[in-house]
C-alpha cells in the first residue's frame, strides 16, 4: 500500500520530498528497538543491523581523566578549562586532557609586595613545641550567656511526678 499525503500538493517536487521523508521515517522506525527505562518511559535505540542512528541525543556523562601519575579526576562534561597537577598544566583538547608544559611559575598573580612578604615568612619553626594560648581565670562567655537564655518560670512539678509515679506502679504492680 502506498503512502498518501492529505496535503494539497502545490508542486511535484514538494510531493516527492514528503514521500521521501515518510519512507525514511518508516525505515528508521522499523530498524529501531524500544528499550524500557522505567515504567512508561522508553528510549529508541538502533538495532544491530540498523545503520541509522537514533534521533535522540545521547546523555553526556562527566569525563573521567587518568593522568600519567595514575591520579584520577572526574570533570564536568561542559568544563572546557585546563588544570594543573603536580607542576604540569593539562589543557583540554576534545574529550582528552593532555599535559602541555611544566609549570614553573605560580598560578597566583604575584606582585613585588607579595614576593617580599613571602620571602619574609619563615616556614621553619625552631621550637618543636607549639605554644598554646594562655588560660583565662575569668568565667567563659559561653556559660555566662547560657544563663541569659533560660526561661525563668515557677513550675510546680509535683502533679506531673505523682502522675508518673502512679502510672509506673500500675504497670509494674
UniProtKB/Swiss-Prot annotation:
<keyword id="KW-0945">Host-virus interaction</keyword>
<comment type="subunit">
    <text>Monomer. Interacting with and inactivating host adenosine kinase 2 (ADK2) in the cytoplasm. Interacts with and inhibits host SNF1 kinase.</text>
</comment>
<dbReference type="GO" id="GO:0030430">
    <property type="term" value="C:host cell cytoplasm"/>
</dbReference>
<dbReference type="GO" id="GO:0005198">
    <property type="term" value="F:structural molecule activity"/>
</dbReference>
<keyword id="KW-0863">Zinc-finger</keyword>
<keyword id="KW-0899">Viral immunoevasion</keyword>
<dbReference type="InterPro" id="IPR000942">
    <property type="entry name" value="Gemini_AL2"/>
</dbReference>
<dbReference type="GO" id="GO:0052170">
    <property type="term" value="P:symbiont-mediated suppression of host innate immune response"/>
</dbReference>
<dbReference type="Pfam" id="PF01440">
    <property type="entry name" value="Gemini_AL2"/>
</dbReference>
<keyword id="KW-1035">Host cytoplasm</keyword>
<keyword id="KW-0941">Suppressor of RNA silencing</keyword>
<protein>
    <recommendedName>
        <fullName>Protein C2</fullName>
    </recommendedName>
</protein>
<feature type="zinc finger region">
    <location>
        <begin position="69"/>
        <end position="85"/>
    </location>
</feature>
<comment type="function">
    <text>Acts as a suppressor of RNA-mediated gene silencing, also known as post-transcriptional gene silencing (PTGS), a mechanism of plant viral defense that limits the accumulation of viral RNAs. Suppresses the host RNA silencing by inhibiting adenosine kinase 2 (ADK2), a kinase involved in a general methylation pathway. Also suppresses the host basal defense by interacting with and inhibiting SNF1 kinase, a key regulator of cell metabolism implicated in innate antiviral defense. Determines pathogenicity.</text>
</comment>
<keyword id="KW-1090">Inhibition of host innate immune response by virus</keyword>
<dbReference type="GO" id="GO:0008270">
    <property type="term" value="F:zinc ion binding"/>
</dbReference>
<keyword id="KW-0862">Zinc</keyword>
<comment type="similarity">
    <text>Belongs to the geminiviridae transcriptional activator protein family.</text>
</comment>
<keyword id="KW-0479">Metal-binding</keyword>
<dbReference type="GO" id="GO:0019028">
    <property type="term" value="C:viral capsid"/>
</dbReference>
Amino acid at each position: 500500500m502506498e503512502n498518501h499525503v492529505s496535503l494539497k500538493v502545490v508542486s511535484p517536487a514538494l510531493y516527492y520530498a514528503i514521500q521521501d521523508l515518510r519512507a525514511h521515517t518508516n525505515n528508521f522506525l522499523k530498524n529501531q528497538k524500544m528499550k524500557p527505562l522505567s515504567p512508561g518511559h522508553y528510549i529508541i535505540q538502533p538495532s544491530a543491523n540498523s545503520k541509522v542512528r537514533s534521533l535522540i541525543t545521547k546523555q553526556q556523562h562527566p569525563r573521567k581523566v587518568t593522568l600519567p601519575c595514575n591520579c584520577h579526576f572526574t570533570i564536568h562534561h561542559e568544563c572546557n578549562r585546563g588544570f594543573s597537577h603536580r607542576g604540569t598544566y593539562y589543557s583540554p583538547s576534545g574529550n582528552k586532557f593532555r599535559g602541555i608544559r611544566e609549570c614553573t611559575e605560580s598560578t597566583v598573580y604575584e606582585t613585588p609586595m607579595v614576593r617580599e612578604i613571602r620571602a619574609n615568612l619563615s616556614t621553619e619553626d625552631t621550637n618543636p613545641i607549639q605554644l598554646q594560648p594562655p588560660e583565662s581565670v575569668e568565667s567563659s562567655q559561653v556559660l555566662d550567656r547560657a544563663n541569659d537564655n533560660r526561661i525563668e518560670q515557677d513550675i510546680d512539678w509535683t502533679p506531673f511526678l505523682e502522675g508518673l509515679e502512679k502510672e509506673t506502679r500500675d504497670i509494674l504492680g
